[in-house]
Amino acid sequence: MLRDGNEGMSTIPGFNQIQFEGFWRFIDQGLTEELSKFPKMEDTDQEIEFQLFVETYQLAEPLIKEKDAVYESLTYSSELYVSAGLIWKTRREMQEQTILIGNIPLMNSLGTFIVNGIYRIVINQILQSPGIYYRSELDHNGISVYTGTIISDWGGRSELEIDRKARIWARVSRKQKISILVLSSAMGSNLREILDNVCYPEIFLSFLNDKEKKKIGSKENAILEFYQQFACVGGDPVFSESLCKDLQKKFFQQRCELGRIGRRNMNRRLNLDIPENNTFLLPRDILAAADHLIGMKFGMGTLDDMNHLKHKRIRSVADLLQDQFGLALVRLENVVRGTISGAIRHKLIPTPQNLVTSTPLTTTFESFFGLHPLSQVLDRTNPLTQIVHGRKLSYLGPGGLTGRTASFRIRDIHPSHYGRICPIDTSEGINVGLIGSLAIHARIGPWGSLESPYYEISERSKRVQMLYLSPSRDEYYMLASGNSLALNQGIQEEQVVPARYRQEFLTIAWEQVHFRSIFSFQYFSIGASLIPFIEHNDANRALMSSNMQRQAVPLSQSEKCIVGTGLERQVALDSGVLAIAEHEGKIIYTNTDKIVLLGNGNTVSIPLVMYQRSNKNTCMHQKPQIPRGKCVKKGQILADGAATVGGELALGKNVLVAYMPWEGYNFEDAVLISERLVYEDIYTSFHIRKYEIQTYVTSQGPEKVTSEIPHLEAHLLRNLDKNGIVRLGSWVETGDILVGKLTPQMAKESSYAPEDRLLRAILGIQVSTSKETCLKLPIGGRGRVIDVRWIQKKGGSSYNPETIHVYISQKREIKVGDKVAGRHGNKGIISRILLRQDMPYLQDGRPVDMIFNPLGVPSRMNVGQIFECSLGLAGSLLDRHYRIAPFDERYEQEASRKLVFSELYEASKQTANPWVFEPEYPGKSRIFDGRTGDPFEQPVIIGNPYILKLIHQVDDKIHGRSSGHYALVTQQPLRGRAKQGGQRVGEMEVWALEGFGVAHILQEMLTYKSDHIKARQEVLGTTIIGGTIPNPEDAPESFRLLVRELRSLALELNHFLVSERNFQINRMEA
């Protein structure tokens, strides 16, 4: 447990600490544990023995740097070397060599891995902890049925249940169950041992009849009976060694291995003293569990809450990597066995290096990082996103739940989450409640449990100590919430405070409190802790805000928030986007690409990140903050990164906002903005896209990168250099060639020119033609070329193609259709950009920058935005920044409102502007219509909230189709922007058009523009030469498809005309 000596002081732990600790545990303990399980191997004649010496393993320095691994699409990894020995027993000789086992991906300073040039992160998983759990359910008759569920380390489940006659059964499958006596006998206990080790032997004897005695008469009979019920085998199976192995593999290995954590939980729940290194289920465990189940039936003992965090364990990066390393060693073992037997068969002399290959380990880790659901591509939209992604907790994944089967109870907040899992920050949609986020101070304990820190309140010692409590321990203490921090120290003993005890919230006297919270942010995740005045918001809107802050785009001119919570500096520091001085010294050179530091007689060059692309195409860039000649100390910030200012997180801008309706343009949360935000680049961001092309060696010859591309217009090739690659700094438009490439292919006989046929006939020369396969800039990709990388991998074969990467930067101003949001879940789409002179203006003549809909506040109950808006106005006028911790009402009633009004009053006094704070309507002000100059009828709330521009931008979403591809079966246009798809006119849209009687438009939609093949071909020709489009004569392709499908069901669809003369109805019959 961590104890902090400083009285009443605690520091926020590093936000990436959980990832670092997990990877260190894998390197320090996991590797040794798995290598020690590697068996000694002998050949069939037992003449050669191979073994690994675990005591001496080495991890070599990485061969490449992180930056090079990203650009060259390689894995940032370290080679693992282990000493191995080969013993010849007949000659009594041993050959020892240090061999390469394989490459292990390394974690970098961000807590992430670089695999094939892509930043990836392994998130933590929450699983049901192995052990035994007792539940009670009502059967169809309304009678309580008690069950005990044993969960193995692999997630397999076995159930014990007790029926009305107090008989105990072990359920081995969904339909089959066997007597507890048969299970215990199959595990090696006889009847006397069973009766000696239970508390209720008379209950066990009560259902012991002659048939049961025969089943448990011997271990072989019990195993046969168990196997017959488990495998649902009919007849009379014969006892054999293979039958035992099959049962061991299918049942006992999967459902009876408890592991270290499961053994500890089993001992605690059943009051056993079995050694913790005995990790398998024993007959003694089964009998103790049955005793406890009988006690439950008689009303003794307590049932288990399966959703309590004390019954969960965290599967961290250490556990996942250790599992994969163990799997790789099993594969390596099979390879070594096969190599030994092959060498003996061919009478070769093996060496340790010849026996071991690095392929199993390398491929296993590459497969894990590429395919495992818990290994995800790092979201690097902004610095906050990077940190939050590594602190996620997921119930999904192997051995966990699925989004469709998880119940509401599992998704819901549990009292044990308090201080460990954020009750607010979770994903929206089908995974709500299944993907959470760690609270700020939470950490993973040695047994996989989540621990939260508290201050211990001791009567004997006045010194405050900080302890980390696990979910199973804090049940036994009275835990005071953050409200107790505000108590007057002199009269604490007389105060009554809210506290938590055994998952209940109580109000108790101060002297009864054992522990108290250490921090007002303790219960929330990083995203939720960055929301000012969060206590005034509805939790649903706070959830949206914590998700939307992760979607904020870094702006070209960042600005830190006027109103914050104080956590912004820590987030920026731990995100890794800042350049930090590693030791003190003097700056002797500074530039946009590097800073040179002189200290202790050594010169250190610190490279800066310049226009680096993130996974979400945002621009990561560092800007120097220290002038040349200045002395710096260790830990001082040398350069700001993307979305940081002065070492603080800066995701958005403080803009002047009015909450008022304006001609209906902010209907349904739409937002009006001033043209100032466009022309002054207030919300301008840079986005970098990567385009790549590979060159292969085909069967007709190698592909060629060249600038000489036939049959293409010259203006498309204008930006290519002599090698056929686009020049740095070129401005490129849609359709331009970025890389010129020709692919060789053999031409058909009929396509040869006469002179080619002559050459072929006389000289026998094979004439080949080339196909143009250039890299072209797709729609919406216009911009400036900022980098070109030509990566030539070793070998140069078709399996290692050369790759060319082209990076293009786009400058995007804010425009109609972009999404903006505040920090309180108030989001909206920009509906119109008004001229500055048309925007409403304040009494000092300043036009507002944005207009929000006031109806978005009362129904959403996110009143925190009003506090932030008004306090931001005071801060902008007084040139102040505020850092306010949440729940300030614990100090005084209406503390937030009093703070805002006092600051507005002071701003009004200092600026001599009485309109800033008017007592009749505090926080509001009379503003004027920019078009007419008349004041609006009602006073309006104005202020400077912090508004973010989100990554959902109209340039990435807007799409139109003139022509494109068609589906092969239905012949209708494809769906989606990526496939150049069309807009579907479905059944309900057809009804809408029918309602207006637009027959010709409807016919166009269903024929020419859709799936009438002949008619849509005629449209093109008619459009070029002019004239009317002919009506389609036959049915469209989708109707023909329906007819064909009916024929496949042996239904023939015919049509014929019924004349009025032959069309008669017998009205009497009808």
Swiss-Prot record:
InterPro entries: DNA-dir_RNA_pol_bsu_ext_1_sf, DNA-dir_RNA_pol_su2, DNA-dir_RNAP_su2_dom, DNA-dir_RNAP_su2_hyb_sf, RNA_pol_bsu_bac, RNA_pol_bsu_CS, RNA_pol_bsu_protrusion, RNA_pol_Rpb2_2
Gene Ontology molecular function: any one: ribonucleoside binding
Catalytic activity: RNA(n) + a ribonucleoside 5'-triphosphate = RNA(n+1) + diphosphate
CDD domains named in the record: RNA_pol_B_RPB2 (cd00653)
Subunit field text: In plastids the minimal PEP RNA polymerase catalytic core is composed of four subunits: alpha, beta, beta', and beta''. When a (nuclear-encoded) sigma factor is associated with the core the holoenzyme is formed, which can initiate transcription.
Matching PANTHER family: DNA-DIRECTED RNA POLYMERASE I SUBUNIT 2 (PTHR20856)
Protein name, as recorded: DNA-directed RNA polymerase subunit beta
Organism per entry: Spinacia oleracea
